[in-house]
Structure formats: C-alpha cells, structure tokens
C-alpha cells in the first residue's frame, strides 16, 4: 500500500505486522527472500528439500501430522524454516533453547508424556485485547493475532494444544516458554481447541491475563530410540536458490540426477540435443552484422552457426516466392536433427532438436512455445539491443538471459523426452484439473477475496491509504495443471509459457527427489494492447502455485523507468491465500483427484491386453448373458454405471429421485451396513482411501484430515464412469481441447507400463491434429474467398468437402517378458479418432478398442461435462 506523508508512521507499524511469517526464520526484520532482490527489481527465490523415494502415502502422512486445525481459517504465518544451518554453533545457541532444540534432532511431542514427566508449570502475564484479532491478516487465528504464538493439537490428544512457534519476539521467549509446551489455561480456565477462540474474543477492552503452561522437557519428547517414534519424520535439510542463474546451474542436477531421469544410450549419449540460432536476415549486408547475434551452444562446432549462410539463403529465396520456410531435416555426425524456422521482430530464429528425442510434430509445437516465451519476455527486442551489449563496461544481461533460457530448454528436452512422444503437454491450451464444484467455489472465493483486498479490518487510516498495486488476475495450479483461473485465456497462455520455459512446472511435477517448500518469483512483464506497468508474481507452496499479475498504481511522482521491487505486503497476501487453500484441503483433493481415474475412467493398456487373452474363452458366456439380459438382473458394477448421471456437471453421481437401495450400492462398503452419512462409515473412509490418510493404518491417527467432511463425502460416492458405448469400458486415452476457453482435459497420469502404447497413440494424435489444422486453415481461406466471390443464387462456387473427422487404426505388438519361458508376442488393435467442432470451437481425440464401434460425437458430449468439474 502507498500512503500520504502524514501516515508514514502508521505505515511502518502496519507493514511490520503484515509481513510477519515464517519468512523471518532468522529473527530479523527482513523476509527470507528480501535480501536476494536483484538490482533491476526482479526476484527468483526458492527453498526446497531433498527427499528420498518413499511412498506417496508416507510423505503425505508426515505432512498431515505437521498441519494445524484452523477451522477453515487461513494462517498468515507459515511453519518456521531452519535457515541457520550454515551458521556456527555459537550463533545457534544465542537464539534461545527453542531454536537449538529444533535443529539438533527431530522430536515428536505427545500429550501422554506429560503424565509421566515431572510437572513444570509456567505462567505468563500479558495485556491482550480482541481488537488485535486481524492485525496479522484476515484469516490469522485468534491465538496468533492476540497472543503472538502458534498452537497445534497434540497428535494423541487433539483437544489439547501445544506451543508450535512464535509469530514474533514476544515476552513469552523471556519466560522460558518454548515449542512443545502445553498451553493449559487462561486466567485459571482450562484451554482446549474448542473454546480457545471464544475465550480470547471476550476481552473487548485491553485486559491483563495470566496464561498457564506446562513444560515439555527433554524427557517428555519422543526420541528416535523410543519405539513410538515415527521414523518418517526426519530432519530435512533446506536448500536455497537465490536467483535464476543459480537455478539454471542446479536445474539439471535437480531434474535429472536427483529425479533419476535420463536413459543411458538414448538422450544422454547425444552430444547436442538442442541448438538455437538468432540472427538478422541482413547479416551479410552490413559489416557489424557479419556474425550471428547469438547461438547456442556457444561452441565453434555448432552446426547452426557454421551453416548460417545456407539458412539465410533458403529464407531469402522462399521469401521472394511469398512463402516462408517451416522446417528442415539435417543429418549431422550420423544424428538426425529437426530444424524449425521462426520469425521474431525481424530476426530469423532457428531451433534444432535431436531426432532421437522428439518427432517433427513435437519439434514444431515446442518451437511455437519457445518463440512465444521469448516474445513475451523480450517484447522490445531489436538489433540495437545487441549493439548495446557490445559496448565496453555494459553488462551482457540479454545474452545471459538467452544462455539461461537455452540451458533450461536443453535440460527439459533431455529429461522429459528420451523417445517418449508427447502431445497434450505441447499444445497451447492449459491442462485443466477440474475439481468438484464445492472445491471450485472455495477456490474462487479465496481468489476473489485476495483480489478484493479489503484493508478495513486492520488499516488505521483508510481514507489516506490507497493500493500500491491492482490485481489484474490470478491463476492457481497444481503442479502443471490448471485448477482455477481469473485471467483472460490469451494472458494465461503467456503466463503458462513463462512457467514451462522457466522449468518451474517440470520441477514441481517431474522431480520426485525434490520437494519445493516455497518459491517466490517477481518480474516485470508487458501485456499486449495494455497500458501501464505490470508485474508477474508467482508464489509456490508444496504442489500449489499461484500466479498473480499486478498493475502498479500510476503515481505522479514516479519515473516511467523507475525500478519497482517486490511488494512485501502483496506477496504475503498471496502466500496467505495459498496457506488457506492448503488448509482447506484443496491440495489434498487435487492430489487424490489426479490419480483417481474416475471421471472418466480410462483403461490400462496392460489390463486391456490381458482381457484380449481372456476374450476367446468367454465369448460363449457373453453371448449367453446378452440373450438373457431381460431375465437376469444387472450386476452391482453395471447398475452403478447405469445410475451414474452424465447429464450435469456436478460430481454427484446420484439424483434425489433415486432410491436408497441404489445409493447403498453406489457407496463403498466399509464393513458395516450403515449408509454413507453415518459416523462409522466416515470413520472407515481412511481404510477405503489410503492415498489420503497414508498406508500406515495400524498406527494411531495423529491428526484429522484437513479436508472438510462435506467435501470428502461428496467424492465418497463417486464411481468410475465410462464414456464409451457397450457393456464394458473401451477407452484408453482421450484429449478434449476447448479452444474458446483455452483449456485442455486429458488423463492426468502416465503409467510406465503404458508408455509404448501412449507413444503410438500420441503419434496418431499428431497426425490427426495436422489434418484437422489444415482443414481449419483451408476453411478460413474458403470462407474469406466465398464472401468475396459468390454466385448470383447466393451459393459459393467451391464444392470441396472439408475434413471434420479423421481416424486411424493402430496395431501395437508387445514383446514377451524375459521370465525364462517361451512366449509369443501379442498384438492389440486400437482406433484413434479426432474430430473438429465449430460451435463452440473444440477438438476431441479419443482412443478406444476396435471391437466395439463408438460415436465420437457422443463421447465428446460426455467429456464436456467432466471438463467442467
């Protein structure tokens, strides 16, 4: 916020309060990222931990154990980090015993230890008032705002609260209060998780209160040698990335070495997997342009640099024929390369990809993505920009940007390709993750409240205060999937290109050895056909990323080229929104939904192959069942699929008119005869869904789920739904592209067993996509010419029929497993169909089995409901 000169003292007070978070892990007045802001105002800061390849459930269970129950409120303070690991031991001792205990060895505090430990009561006198309820944010808890410390429920006694950390240096640190102490009483009244908020809100006027604590000493904490110690909770070494050049240096190590990507003999053996050349077409007409402006790799053996004259000649010859070159295929040192030509502000840009890593269609889509990112990041790139770089004493910031950009693309290509064909990841649309309606409403409420920015609850001078920035729009992502967006589609495409080409999406979703705890990105951008200065802000917490575009308030006293650094207040507001979404269970729901394979269900290729082998013995039985269909009652699975509603976008698969017996059949059986609304049914939900609660079901439950009961009950009744016709599901893959909204809906996970099948399916999708794109281009050309030239009767003279639907039949052979037995290779036949729709504009690609004919129009109609959530 920006204030008038008369309100500067209150501004210092307001900013100091609003910026308190775990970013102040070293006890200073600066956030953990503030000292890494560059001279031009940009910021790239990340904290991550290296985690071993344990099960997903183990990692998620530890995460749930560390969370607190905020009753739907958003915490404005995140968990403290161990940022002082590189400091000396004397410095660690000077910060108090609480920080020293948290850095020596991991401890798990239990309420049962207080029964055996000697009582060590502590008291703390404070003057509190309920007027401080919102001084740390809109949804900060009452304990944080009024008392100044955070509390957590004990794992074995959720009703009792323990001290988890301190918001700032309150007097509690001077009285020996430390992490793990039992927050026992307030003015002699026992404090529990259910009554702490009501007790604190009663003090309307400033009142002196006495807080009672009981210490949890070294004997009270569970040590690693105790049998009750949870070994999954281990000390995590936090690593920092202070700027983007440092991120570029570590990106290959994080994504390939620690992510265990790369296949020996394929992508690693290629000496030059990616190359780039940027040069002006008139480089031989002027002496100062004899050499190319930039080429990567910056080595003399770069074949693009050595053959730049041939590329310029080809470009000049085709330009005289009123056409442009698109791609070339070269053979360099027995390695095939695909070279794509692109135009950028009068420059000729060449991208070369090794043919063993990706096909020609993939290279074309990748080149479109890269040139879009360069156009978005360098909108004013002209020849003079490079001439300024040659001046002595001037920093080569532009060439450093291009070098880092190319290094990231080379690592992305090596890590993500290695022979596996990609299709939906390379399209310009956003890969959406449609969550249930209740979750979508909560997300949009949180984003709308963040954009509203109502300061009246904690702003002392609202009349003399105005916003420093205006929020242009925001978008929420889970890994690389779009969860919700309040951005225009064309702007969102540019933002996602920024996230992909910077390697952020690959790091979040494709590096299992890396867990990103926090990330902050601040960079000035230029929006097309928009006035003013805009800044892209990206905040990441675990798997959730929130991208926000801010527009600065045009102050009269601000210079047009003034350096604008990151806004501490706005970054904290964005991070608070992320904390609120994580606490509401959005991250857990997105993780569950991305691997559920229910809406709609797709077949596993290996299961489909085994079904082919069993098909012949079961032909007679199936024919008998078809004849007796009117006599025999349908099975539970068939009846569940028939009762599933495809006529609406709600995630509920039941309608009010359905009877209770059908509802019981659709509800998973939990060992009791009660329905899904009973308490025992909800308690046994963890057994049926170990992905959310962890596979260690024998251990005692340490914390409640952050997902609300209504949201989990909403997805509890969800059954797998098929979009194909026939008795059984026959769909293996689908891609639903909504061109109007700029979104894409496809299966979320790729199994390693299905990689060969998916590569063939995506290759067929590339071929069909090229046919449909040519049809769309010719349709536009035909409509323009038909409007100019029409017959007297009003009909066009062109009678060429355009392609709306195109299909292919694939036969994939599988090699027998090397188990010592002689087995013959089997083959499976699939049908890949793509169709182009006009109103609304969309493309649909479906791969299904060839034994049952399908109607792609009907399948596209069913997919349209699931794409909305």
Swiss-Prot record:
Keyword Membrane: yes
GO BP of this protein: cilium assembly; establishment of imaginal disc-derived wing hair orientation; nervous system development; non-sensory hair organization; vesicle-mediated transport
Region listing for Disordered, in residue ranges: 1-28, 70-106
Biased composition (Basic residues): 70-80
InterPro entries: CCZ1/INTU/HSP4_longin_1 (IPR043987), CCZ1/INTU/HSP4_longin_3 (IPR043989), CCZ1/INTU_longin_2 (IPR043988), INTU (IPR039151), PDZ_sf (IPR036034)
GO CC annotations on file: cilium; cytoplasm; plasma membrane
Taxonomic lineage of the native organism: Eukaryota, Metazoa, Ecdysozoa, Arthropoda, Hexapoda
Official protein name in the record: Protein inturned
Role description: Plays a role in the definition of cell polarity via the planar cell polarity (PCP) cascade. Acts downstream of fuz and accumulates asymmetrically in wing cells to regulate planar polarity in the wing. Probably acts by regulating ciliogenesis.
Compositionally biased spans, kind Low complexity: 81-97
UniProtKB keywords: Cell membrane, Cilium biogenesis/degradation, Cytoplasm, Developmental protein, Membrane
Localization terms from the record: Cytoplasm; Cell membrane
Recorded family membership: Belongs to the inturned family.
Inactivation phenotype: Abnormal wing hair polarity and in many wing cells forming two or more hairs instead of the normal single hair.
Domain of life: Eukaryota
One Pfam short name: Intu_longin_2
Quaternary structure and partners: Interacts with mwh.
């Amino acid at each position: 916020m920006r204030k008038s000169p008369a309100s500067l003292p209150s501004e210092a007070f307001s900013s100091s309060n609003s910026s308190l978070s775990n970013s102040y892990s070293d006890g200073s007045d600066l956030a953990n990222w503030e000292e890494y802001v560059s001279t031009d105002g940009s910021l790239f800061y990340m904290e991550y931990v290296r985690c071993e390849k344990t099960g997903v459930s183990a990692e998620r269970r530890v995460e749930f154990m560390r969370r607190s129950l905020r009753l739907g409120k958003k915490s404005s303070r995140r968990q403290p980090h161990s940022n002082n690991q590189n400091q000396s031991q004397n410095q660690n001792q000077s910060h108090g015993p609480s920080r020293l205990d948290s850095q020596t060895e991991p401890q798990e505090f239990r309420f049962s230890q207080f029964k055996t430990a000697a009582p060590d009561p502590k008291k703390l006198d404070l003057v509190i008032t309920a007027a401080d309820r919102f001084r740390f944010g809109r949804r900060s808890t009452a304990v944080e705002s009024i008392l100044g410390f955070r509390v957590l429920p004990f794992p074995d006694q959720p009703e009792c609260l323990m001290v988890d950390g301190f918001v700032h240096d309150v007097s509690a640190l001077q009285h020996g209060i430390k992490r793990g102490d039992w927050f026992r009483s307030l003015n002699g009244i026992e404090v529990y998780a259910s009554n702490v908020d009501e007790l604190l809100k009663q003090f309307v006027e400033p009142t002196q209160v006495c807080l009672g604590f009981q210490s949890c000493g070294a004997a009270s904490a569970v040590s690693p040698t105790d049998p009750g110690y949870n070994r999954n909770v281990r000390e995590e070494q936090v690593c920092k990335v202070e700027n983007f050049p440092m991120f570029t240096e570590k990106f290959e190590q994080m994504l390939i070495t620690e992510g265990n990507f790369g296949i020996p003999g394929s992508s690693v053996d290629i000496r030059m997997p990616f190359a780039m050349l940027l040069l002006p077409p008139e480089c031989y007409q002027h002496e100062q342009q004899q050499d190319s402006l930039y080429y990567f790799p910056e080595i003399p053996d770069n074949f693009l640099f050595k053959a730049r004259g041939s590329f310029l000649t080809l470009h000049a010859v085709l330009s005289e024929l009123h056409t442009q070159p698109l791609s070339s295929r070269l053979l360099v040192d027995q390695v095939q390369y695909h070279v794509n030509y692109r135009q950028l502000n009068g420059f000729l840009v060449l991208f070369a990809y090794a043919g063993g890593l990706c096909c020609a269609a993939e290279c074309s889509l990748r080149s479109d993505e890269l040139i879009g990112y360069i156009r978005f990041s360098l909108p004013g790139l002209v020849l003079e920009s490079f001439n300024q770089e040659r001046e002595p004493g001037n920093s080569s910031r532009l060439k450093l940007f291009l070098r880092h950009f190319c290094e990231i693309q080379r690592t992305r290509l090596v890590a993500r390709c290695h022979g596996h064909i990609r299709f939906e990841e390379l399209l310009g649309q956003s890969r959406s993750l449609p969550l249930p309606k209740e979750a979508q409403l909560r997300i949009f409420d949180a984003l709308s409240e963040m954009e509203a920015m109502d300061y009246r609850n904690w702003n002392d001078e609202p009349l003399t205060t105005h916003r420093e920035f205006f929020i242009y729009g925001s978008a929420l992502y889970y890994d690389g999937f779009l969860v919700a967006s309040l951005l225009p589609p064309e702007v969102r495409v540019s933002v996602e290109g920024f996230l992909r080409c910077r390697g952020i999406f690959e790091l979040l979703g494709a590096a299992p050895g890396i867990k990103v705890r926090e990330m902050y990105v601040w960079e000035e951008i230029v929006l097309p056909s928009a006035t003013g200065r805009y800044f892209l802000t990206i905040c990441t917490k675990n798997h959730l990323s929130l991208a926000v575009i801010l527009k600065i308030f045009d102050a009269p006293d601000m210079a047009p080229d003034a350096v604008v650094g990151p806004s501490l207040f706005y970054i904290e507001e964005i991070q608070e929104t992320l904390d609120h979404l994580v606490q509401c269970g959005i991250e857990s729901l997105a993780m569950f939904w991305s691997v559920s394979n229910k809406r709609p269900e797709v077949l596993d290729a290996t299961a489909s192959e085994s079904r082919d082998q069993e098909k012949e013995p079961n032909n007679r039985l199936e024919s008998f069942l078809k004849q007796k269909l009117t006599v025999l009652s349908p099975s539970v699975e068939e009846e569940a699929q028939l009762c599933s509603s495809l006529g609406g976008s709600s995630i509920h698969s039941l309608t009010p008119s359905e009877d209770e017996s059908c509802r019981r059949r659709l509800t998973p059986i939990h060992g009791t005869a009660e329905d899904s609304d009973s308490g025992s049914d909800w308690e046994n939900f963890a057994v049926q869904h170990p992905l959310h609660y962890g596979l260690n079901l024998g251990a005692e439950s340490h914390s409640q789920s952050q997902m609300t009961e209504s949201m989990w009950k909403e997805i509890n009744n969800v059954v797998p739904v098929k979009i194909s016709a026939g008795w059984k599901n026959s769909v293996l893959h689908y891609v639903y592209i909504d061109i109007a909204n700029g979104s894409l809906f496809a299966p979320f996970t790729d199994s390693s067993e299905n990689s060969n099948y998916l590569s063939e399916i995506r290759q067929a999708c590339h071929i069909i996509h090229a046919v449909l794109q040519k049809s769309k281009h010719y349709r536009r050309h035909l409509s323009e010419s038909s409007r100019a030239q029409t017959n007297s009767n009003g009909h066009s003279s062109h009678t060429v029929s355009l392609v709306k639907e195109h299909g292919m039949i694939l036969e994939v052979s599988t090699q027998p497993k090397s188990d010592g037995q002689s087995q013959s290779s089997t083959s499976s036949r699939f049908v890949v169909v793509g169709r182009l729709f006009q109103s609304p504009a969309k493309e649909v690609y479906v791969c299904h089995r060839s034994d049952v004919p399908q109607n792609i129009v009907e399948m596209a109609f069913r997919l349209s409901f699931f794409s909305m959530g």
